[in-house]
Amino acid sequence: MLLCLTALYAQRADNYPPTKNAQVKLSETNLPIVFIDVDGKMILREERITAKIKIIDNGTGKTNYADLAAHPDQKVDYEGYISLKYRGNSSFNSSDKKPYGFKTIAKPLEEGGKKVKVSLLGLGKDNDWVLLAPFADKTMIRDVLTFELGRPYLDWVPSSRHVEVVVDGKYYGIYILTERPGKGKNRLNLHDPGEDGGDLTGDWRVEIDRDDEDHYYRSKYHPYGRYGTVDNTKYITYQYDDPEYEDFADLPAGTEKAIQKSIDDMEDCFAGDNYKDPVNGYRKYIDV
């Protein structure tokens, strides 16, 4: 009985309906409209499914209509296949409005689903995108405002567009179509990992996140708690983002160990007495 109930709960948890006011029907808007068609399939958190996407954008100051049959001559910004999943940890668990991650692909996953780089709503060409779901933020502009405040000072900041989202004919509300951080001409300027004369070369991208992935690196240091003391019950874990763990098999031997050593060297410096040293201190590891 317990296993049966657990399975039913898991299935229900992945069929998230629109949030409050589910009876609201989108008719027209000055924002682009993103139509996602999953053909009734269940959207999951860990595995991607094949879906279709169609983006209507008649231009700045123009009205976009949700009834495609009644308005067949609207401008289609992009139409094609995507691999779709839910995304986020806190943003997923603490919100009734679920964020999505998707990659643009040339054909369905069942037929190979090779990724294809495209420009969506004027954003730089790439294949990795997210739909942020402003739920607690009733202004729906805090994420975008933060991006814009950081843009003059950082080498790269995600660009984004507010959009209306419709999934399988149901209106899900206003989302923020956003570039996902990653390696690419229009994203982060990272060099491919490789080898030169026995030395490992290239760039790696990791992030501090929860230890809910199958493979991660746990720091040998514990974090500080709210009262300024070390909390030995908690851990700092690094997730492999680029390259991902699955890519290590195709990279030079020792790549994972090299990433871990780089993390150790950085943290040892931060925890050492000479962390302020102008040459070998934190400036060696952080772009300040």
Question: What are these language model-derived features?
Answer:
Residues L2-A10:
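Hydrophobic h-region of N-terminal signal peptides that target proteins for export
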Residues A10-V288:
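Phosphate/dinucleotide-binding and metal-coordinating scaffold of catalytic cores
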